[in-house]
Amino acid sequence: MAVLLAGCAVTAPTPAASTSTPAAPTATATPSPTDTRVETPSADAALPPVQPVGDPVVIASGLDAPWSILRLPTGATLISERDTALVRELLPDGSLRDAGTVAEVEPNGEGGLLGLAFLPGDDGSAGWVYAYFSAASDNRIVRMPLTGSAGGLGFGAGEPVLTGIPLAGNHNGGRIGFGPDGMLYATAGDAGIPGNAQNLDSLGGKILRMTPTGEVPAGNPFDTLVFSYGHRNPQGIAWDSHGQLWASEFGQNTWDELNRIDAGGNYGWPEVEGIGGGGGGFIDPVQQWATDEASPSGLAIVDDTLFMASLRGARLWRILPSTGTVDPWFTDSFGRLRDVVSGPGGTLWFVSNNTDGRGSPAPGDDRLYQVEVAP
């Protein structure tokens, strides 16, 4: 368990919740400061919604462009750094040690070492750490055997899981995670070529689904790795208690999105940005934001309450699909926020991203924060 650093609480005002009823959307709607239209899915028994309680505290500081927080089943935590290609281990006193460097990472613009995921071993081994990263000519996913124990974690040589994901200075996607079905999911951006998103022969602009070793699993809608398409730059994925996959996505100039992901779904990019009324067979987002209020990256779900980290928006969004409630937390308190995950003991962890070249870092940035969440 991490020991919280004393004297690091930061006070932030409690927001007033905002709710709205979905209106009939139009493809040419003018952006409002925040569009809070949320569709309400059917659910058996809704879990009580949760929200942050009290002030966030700093768990660790001195991170360099952190990208992904990976909490292991043992309670240990690893954090990827985009530009250094380092995986850092969080120690109980809040300090950080280098667990290792991921080989072949070539940082460039928004590319570098991005998402992390973990697969427990089924043969008595410690399991596998998966990494999504930008190499010299493509984005790729590797897996590395986890070695050592808490306080001395490391990993062995990587073996390829997937190569050939389109690469660019931006729009690289990069989030990975194992779903409740045991399959590995990955978000792939359009690599700055909008046409990739509608091209089913391209891995770009997609959410991908694969076996732990990179093969096409049974049940994929096109008998390829493509699970959904029509995405611009999705950077967050998470599953609710019903096994439903959700994804956050960067828009271009008008709308950022939160999408409920269905197998084979076409989410519209580049034909549609934001809510387009369902024309052309495109699936509308369940939520959209003006880009200066979001630029969403990491996504976490706690008791079916969604939390979304926002970069340009510099806030943590809380979304309740069951009621249509959307509200911002900690606006401008910590700068750009890159990732958010469920923490230990009824907490939420999130990491700032002010050292990524687009923020205004303060001394000690970037930081990992913890805040309690409760109904």
Question: Where is each model-derived feature located?
Answer:
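Sec-dependent N-terminal signal peptides
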Residues: 1-2
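C-terminal motif of bacterial Sec signal peptides marking the signal peptidase cleavage site
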Residues: 5-7
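Acidic, Gly/Ser/Thr-rich repeat motifs that build Ca2+-stabilized beta-propeller blades
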Residues: 9-15, 22-193, 244-251, 293-330, ...
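Surface-exposed loop and turn segments in beta-propeller and other repeat-based domains
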Residues: 97-109, 157-172, 210-229, 265-291
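Short loop/turn segments immediately following beta-strands, especially the blade-tip
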Residues: 144-153, 208-217, 261-269, 273, ...
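Secondary-structure boundary elements
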Residues: 179-185, 209-221, 239-243
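Repeat-solenoid scaffold signature
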Residues: 226-255
